Amino acid sequence: MVKKFFYSLHYSERIMSNYPLETIRHSAAHVMAAAVQQLYPDAKFDIGPSTENGFYYDFDMEHRLVTEDLKAIEKAMKKLIGRKLPFECFEMNRADAEKMLSEAGQTYKLERLADIPEDAKITFYKTGDFVDLCRGPHVANSGEIGAVKLLSIAGSYFRGDEKNKMLQR
């Protein structure tokens, strides 16, 4: 088995991995969302993709994040990474997915669910207590993410439209 080395400014060390960097970063975004959910249970989540230089997750919550909050989120992420939590994929039919997201108050995810074609599979990934509407892929467990460093906070309009609510990124 050949292992590849990946390096990013968002990672404090080289990571030996069988996964593409995009997959590692996307998984890191999920772990960040799980950490935010632990610290701020009222958070509503939109999307959390990998980017050319790292990853982000857009969310809406009462608490306005400041730079000092990044340390607490990062600390919670490191604990989740250390627990080597599995990324478990499961499918749901549309009605059950709508019910679950509605009961959880995840209004942005409900809108994203509506974008999925009627005949498409609806997949979720569970990492610890965090469950996310997501097509993947992900690493097998959070321990395969390696070290992370959160660098900044930004704002982003839902769906990139200034008429929509400003989310935190």
Functional labels for PLM-detected ranges:
Residues 21-40, 50:
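Active/ligand-binding-proximal structured segments within catalytic/core domains
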Residues 3-15:
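Short, Lys/Arg-enriched N-terminal segments with co-localized hydrophobic residues
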Residues 13-21, 35, 44-47, 56-169:
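Auxiliary tRNA-acceptor-end handling modules of aminoacyl-tRNA synthetases
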